[in-house]
Structures are given as C-alpha cells and as structure tokens.
Amino acid sequence: MPTLTSYFGFLLAALTITSALFIGLSKIRLI
C-alpha cells in the first residue's frame, strides 16, 4: 500500500526533524 509507506515516511521525516531541532537547541544551550 503506497499510502501506508508514505505515511511511515512522513512520520520518520517528522521524527528526524524534531530530534535534529532538539539536538540543535541543546547544543545552543550548552554554548
């Protein structure tokens, strides 16, 4: 099912962006 694949892809992208933002904020806070 392409819809399920696209949904999981979107979820993975959102999770990656969120984690990257969190790591970036943590690094800025450490500096």
UniProtKB/Swiss-Prot annotation:
One function term, GO molecular function aspect: electron transporter, transferring electrons within cytochrome b6/f complex of photosystem II activity
- A Pfam family in this protein? PetL
Predominant subcellular localization, coarse grouping: plastid
Keywords from UniProt, A to Z, are: Chloroplast, Electron transport, Membrane, Photosynthesis, Plastid, Thylakoid, Transmembrane, Transmembrane helix, Transport
TM ranges: 4-26
One GO cellular component assignment for this chain's record is: chloroplast thylakoid membrane
What membrane topology does this protein have? Single-pass membrane protein
The question of whether Cytoplasm is a record keyword is answered with no
Gene Ontology biological-process entries: photosynthesis
Where is this protein localized, as stated in its record?
Plastid, Chloroplast thylakoid membrane
Record's HAMAP family? Cytb6_f_PetL
Q: Which family does it belong to?
A: Belongs to the PetL family.
User: What does the protein in this record do?
Assistant: Component of the cytochrome b6-f complex, which mediates electron transfer between photosystem II (PSII) and photosystem I (PSI), cyclic electron flow around PSI, and state transitions. PetL is important for photoautotrophic growth as well as for electron transfer efficiency and stability of the cytochrome b6-f complex.
Q: Share what the entry says about its subunit structure, partners included.
A: The 4 large subunits of the cytochrome b6-f complex are cytochrome b6, subunit IV (17 kDa polypeptide, PetD), cytochrome f and the Rieske protein, while the 4 small subunits are PetG, PetL, PetM and PetN. The complex functions as a dimer.
Q: What is this protein called?
A: Cytochrome b6-f complex subunit 6
